From Swiss-Prot:
Species annotation: Gibberella fujikuroi (strain CBS 195.34 / IMI 58289 / NRRL A-6831) (Bakanae and foot rot disease fungus)
Free-text function comment from the UniProt entry: Efflux pump; part of the gene cluster that mediates the biosynthesis of bikaverin, a red pigment also considered as a mycotoxin.
Knocked-out gene: effects: Leads to decreased production of bikaverin.
Name of the molecule in the record: Efflux pump bik6
Annotated glycosylation sites: 241
Molecular function via GO: transmembrane transporter activity
UniProt lineage: Eukaryota, Fungi, Dikarya, Ascomycota, Pezizomycotina
Cellular component terms per the entry's GO annotation: plasma membrane
UniProt keyword list: Glycoprotein, Membrane, Transmembrane, Transmembrane helix
InterPro entries: MFS, MFS_dom, MFS_trans_sf
Pfam families: MFS_1
């Protein structure tokens, strides 16, 4: 598809608005992404979700081959395991660059160009001749592959109205949770079949390249300011009226100024109690998701002596828990929709929190159950697998509700709030796999999981606090007071 078809056809000269400011023309203007046909909105959301899915899949599939990498290159397991952590650390740094790029050049190519480079680095990992190459290529695969992670949320906001976007955001969010649970299972199958760890990376590069081609062909630009700027430029050429312009061109932020904003403001927002507390909570549950890469391998692989594929199957229980929680979040959108209508279609952040309030208890219970039904205490694996399911339920409800609450609370500053959240949670998730294995070996899965469960209990009051006093807290915040209307 060319850009003209992406824009929905040739612009008409009479589309220029009064005052020489070019804008969309109401609900009938198909150039406005929020007026796209439902089918186009659905497949666009699906493409963005899959694009994000494969890079989060890449973050986890590597773990299945860690032991082989350690043996082949004669390094410790901890050094080989750093390949997982370095890619996730790349997730923390990349959005600081890609987010401002998308504000200047739109959503599509600032996401896809780095994504292509990330896929190339996956092939670099697959053909590596030493451990240094593996670690370097994994890190840069994370930096460049993080582009859709930082941009997809904005794309969904571009094309769905506030009342509609709850379900698409849940469906997108589940890809962040589901892909890391499938990665170890598929990776374990490659290892068990004798293909070796390199084919886990070849597979990653192949699926990312295929996704890149699909996106290049079928994804359309959706950033309203960029679309209106292009429209104004086209009208200036066709009419000769060079005073025509988009509202966004009156300020024309540069990439340098946006880079400064995206580097500084996210850390300023961490001083806000809402952003800080929810970032701590989401970072912890996200880190536990990646800690599972090690804890499951230890519990089901080493201690229960299951094979390389079977030992990864408990991730299916985690996935089922995530899907169950996603359904609960979608159901909560009915409640949210009623609150939105009652509030004159202005966001009601606190209406996002009920799933999180319940899910927090499931998360804590799951961690306790996993730890105290480990092989040292219970011979049957099923109680611990039920604990894994509850952990999945809790993770998804906490993660998705928190991000939706941040978007509704910080409105025009939501991108910075999400950037701060992404940075902190990625740093935490990258760090956990480095120490979970030695910690569990030293104090046991039971006490290790108990420590994590106790931390989660300390965080339980957060959604209740914001549900009751969130409006007052928002009204006092420099960045959140705009959501109090």
């Amino acid at each position: 598809m060319n850009e003209e078809s992406n824009m929905g056809g040739v612009f008409k000269e009479e589309e220029a608005q009064s005052g020489d400011v070019v804008d969309f023309e109401g609900d009938s203007d198909t150039h406005n992404p929020q007026n796209w046909p439902m089918g186009k909105k659905v497949y666009t959301t699906a493409l963005w979700a899959l694009t994000t899915c494969w890079i989060t899949f890449a973050s986890a599939i590597y773990s299945a081959g860690t032991a082989e990498i350690s043996e082949e290159f004669h390094v410790s397991y901890e050094v080989a395991n750093a390949g997982t952590s370095l890619l996730i650390f790349g997730f923390a740094l990349g959005p600081m660059l890609w987010a401002p790029l998308c504000e200047v050049y739109g959503r599509k190519w600032p996401a896809l160009a780095p994504y292509f480079i990330s896929a190339a680095f996956a092939f670099g990992t697959a053909t590596a001749k030493d451990i240094q190459t593996i670690l370097i290529t994994r890190f840069f695969a994370g930096v460049f592959g993080s582009s859709p992670i930082s941009i997809t949320g904005g794309s969904i906001v571009d094309i769905w109205t506030p009342r509609q976007r709850g379900t698409p955001m849940v469906c997108y969010g589940i890809t962040i949770a589901a892909a890391p649970t499938l990665g170890p299972i598929i990776g374990g199958a490659f290892i068990a079949s004798g293909c070796g760890w390199r084919w886990t990376e070849y597979l990653t590069g192949i699926v990312m390249m295929v996704q890149f081609v699909l996106d290049a062909l079928w994804l359309d630009e959706s950033h309203a300011d960029v679309l209106l700027t292009r429209k104004a430029s086209r009208l200036r050429r066709s009419t000769g009226n060079f005073s025509l312009h988009a509202k966004w061109e009156e300020t024309s932020p540069t990439f340098k100024s946006l880079l400064s904003t995206y580097l500084v403001r996210p850390f300023q927002m961490l001083l806000d109690p809402i952003c800080l507390l929810l970032t701590i909570y989401t970072s912890f549950v996200y880190a536990i998701l990646y800690a599972s890469l090690e804890s499951f391998a230890l519990e089901y692989g080493r201690f229960r002596r299951w094979g390389p594929v079977v030992s990864q199957l408990p991730f299916l229980s985690l996935l089922i828990g995530c899907l169950f929680a996603a359904a609960a979040n979608i159901f909560n959108n009915i409640y949210y929709g009623k609150k939105l209508v009652a509030n004159n279609f202005k966001p009601v952040p606190e209406a996002r929190l009920p799933p999180m309030m319940v899910g927090g208890f499931a998360f804590s219970a799951g961690l306790f159950l996993f730890g105290w039904t480990s092989v040292e205490h219970v011979s049957s694996p099923w109680p611990s697998i039920i604990g894994v399911f509850l952990t999945g339920v809790g993770f998804t409800t906490i993660f998705q509700s928190s991000l939706q609450y941040l978007v509704d609370t910080f409105t025009r500053y939501s991108a910075s709030a999400i950037a701060a959240n992404t940075f902190v949670r990625s740093m935490a998730a990258g760090a956990f796999p480095l120490f979970v294995w030695p910690m569990y070996e030293k104090i046991g899965i039971d006490w290790g999981s108990t420590i994590f469960a106790c931390i989660s209990v300390l965080l339980l009051p957060a959604p209740f606090l914001f549900f009751k006093w969130g409006y007052r807290i928002r009204a006092r915040g420099e960045f959140s007071k705009l959501s109090t209307y």
